[in-house]
Amino acid sequence: MSGGRRVYIDDTPGETRGIIESDQGFEHILIERDGDDPARRLGAVSVGRITRVEPGLSGAFVDLGRSEGFLPLPRKASAHIGQKVEVEVVAEPREAKGPTLRMLAPAEGEVRLIRAGPSVREWLERLAQGVTPITGKAAIEAGWAAIEDAAVPAMPHGGPDVAVERTRAMIAVDIDQPPVPGKGLNARDRQNANHEGLKIAARLIRLRRWGGLVAVDLLGAGHDGARITAAARAAFGGDPAIAYGPVNRFGVLQLVLPWTFTPLEEQTRPDIESAARDLARKLNHALLADTTRARVTARCHGDISKIAAPLVARLGPRAHVMADDSLPPTQVIVE
């Protein structure tokens, strides 16, 4: 633990989760799965081949082997189909789009991966240097809690009420302060609510792994623009890729955040494979919670059990899975 930060690694078969928690709440959840294409991970470097040049999009599509990525190009840059380029992933896939790439250098030879992006453990070391990760049952529970917090965040008692919503065009943040009976809000109260609200909004946006245009509807009017901008920089960070705008006359602060990881809601969208991974995680949690039990069995629908069986086998001889087609695909019973 360092500076109130806690780091967790849940290394359940099929999926590794890394979680960072601060005194304000969960800050990051990183997910790495068996079968993920390493060429699509943030920070991966590959030799790719340009397959299409799209002047209208100011870029080109690049074959990375198992998938394509999009390479933005300067207006006067020359590129042609078949050209080999060395590229780095600067934003992971989202909304049915492939990864966004950055040109490193011209290249030769076959399309290939040169260097995979950092693993979950490597990202945790970068984001929380020197903090020893917590593993086991507590790490599994932290992952569940972080995903729940991202979906239904709890506001601090007595603090501002902050709504953070994403549309296709932007992220909208609304900061409000619930009234206290018999007490009005003065200028200092509004300032404190806005500063605390910016911290909450920044934490939730990081946790949800969102980027793009952010519009923050601040509480009150007549804001000190310099103070608000300083508070926003403290909350969202000093990354030079973040663009901060002024507070406009309507009391709205705008900023632009770079996209990095795939949004959390996309990466955790339920399907049959995620159900199998969830089963393995629940079974692993039960095994860790009671090490005296000789046998722990998870019952689930047959379609899930077929995919889950290899993952369960990696948990050891105490773990078992049983097909039960009377159960819906969303239900798992651990016994």
For each of these PLM feature ranges, what is it?
Residues 1-57, 63-71, 77-169, 320-335:
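Extended, charged alpha/beta regions that create polyanion-binding interfaces
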Residues 60, 93, 159-333:
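Conserved glycine-centered short motifs in functionally critical loops
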